[in-house]
């Protein structure tokens, strides 16, 4: 039997006569090779299309984890920008449901419990609804700037990416200039579903923030490390870093 590489490079090795196409019986080796080729090409094309879509603000605010995924075969939800049944990262469409970019108080007071208002709740449910809301998405500069390596980042990496947000939806009525000043907010460092939310970083809450950070690391299966005040190079990032570690959205994607 010819090797797969030989089949791909030399169709003549199949010993098939193409004089009468109707009489040709395609060998299973060719069908298998063709299937693998088409599958790889389709996957590459879908990945490129997803990457292009995620670079668009409109897509991120109104389609990311909102539009139902149309793929029939099994795939990695964490690498797919579309919504799947039972996925914790799913969002309500802000164009169809009138909710604001403010966190739902029931999600904060009742960890793990469903909001009694359900899908009609006027507040954001979860990290993705909160930070991808048009009143918040990219209205804050990312601390890492162009060096950011997050696959999904809710913040602006250049001045050109900064958005003013919608005045009717935003409680802060931000302008692009004001976002570069002292107004800093960041996503919660803890997993949103099942844990309390942390909306800002405050030095007086350092102990509580460190506890949340340690929990987030345990949720991701990372090794628990106790910070040492005498350590020259801390293992964990300081809790006063407003942009926070990239744990919350990851845990939500894989739930």
UniProtKB/Swiss-Prot annotation:
Q: Which UniProt keywords apply?
A: DNA-binding, Metal-binding, Repeat, Zinc, Zinc-finger
Which Pfam families does the protein's record reference? zf-CCCH, zf-CCCH_AtC3H23
> Which pairs of positions does the record mark as disulfide bonds?
none
C3H1-type ZnF: 98-128, 137-159
For this protein, the record's InterPro entries field holds: Unkempt-like (IPR045234), Znf_CCCH (IPR000571)
Q: Name one GO molecular function term.
A: zinc ion binding
The highest taxon in the source lineage is Eukaryota
Q: Note the coiled coil stretches, chain numbering.
A: none
Keyword presence, Zinc:
yes
Q: Kindly give the PANTHER family that the UniProt entry links to this protein.
A: UNKEMPT FAMILY MEMBER, ZINC FINGER CCCH DOMAIN-CONTAINING PROTEIN 10
Q: What is this protein called?
A: Zinc finger CCCH domain-containing protein 37
Give the lineage.
Answer: Eukaryota, Viridiplantae, Streptophyta, Embryophyta, Tracheophyta
């Amino acid at each position: 039997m010819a090797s797969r590489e030989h089949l791909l490079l030399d169709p003549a090795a199949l010993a098939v006569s193409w004089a009468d196409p109707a009489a040709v019986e395609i060998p299973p080796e060719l069908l298998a090779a063709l299937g693998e080729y088409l599958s790889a090409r389709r996957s590459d094309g879908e990945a490129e299309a997803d990457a292009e879509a995620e670079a668009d603000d409109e897509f991120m605010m109104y389609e990311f984890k909102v539009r139902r995924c149309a793929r029939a075969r099994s795939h990695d939800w964490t690498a797919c920008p579309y919504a799947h049944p039972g996925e914790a990262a799913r969002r309500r469409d802000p164009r169809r449901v009138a909710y604001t970019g403010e966190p739902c108080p029931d999600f904060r007071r009742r960890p793990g419990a469903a909001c009694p208002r359900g899908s009609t709740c006027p507040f954001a449910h979860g990290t993705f609804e909160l930070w991808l809301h048009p009143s918040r998405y990219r209205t804050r500069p990312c601390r890492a700037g162009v060096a950011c390596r997050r696959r999904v980042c809710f913040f602006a990496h250049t001045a050109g990416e900064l958005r003013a947000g919608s005045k009717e939806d935003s409680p802060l009525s931000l302008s692009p200039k004001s976002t570069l000043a002292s107004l800093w907010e960041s996503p919660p460092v803890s997993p949103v579903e099942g844990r309390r939310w942390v909306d800002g970083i405050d030095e007086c809450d350092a102990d509580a923030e460190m506890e949340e950070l340690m929990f987030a690391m345990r949720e991701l299966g990372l090794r628990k490390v106790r910070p040492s005040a005498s350590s020259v190079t801390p293992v964990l990032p300081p809790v006063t870093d407003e942009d926070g570690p990239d744990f919350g959205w990851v845990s939500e994607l894989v739930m």
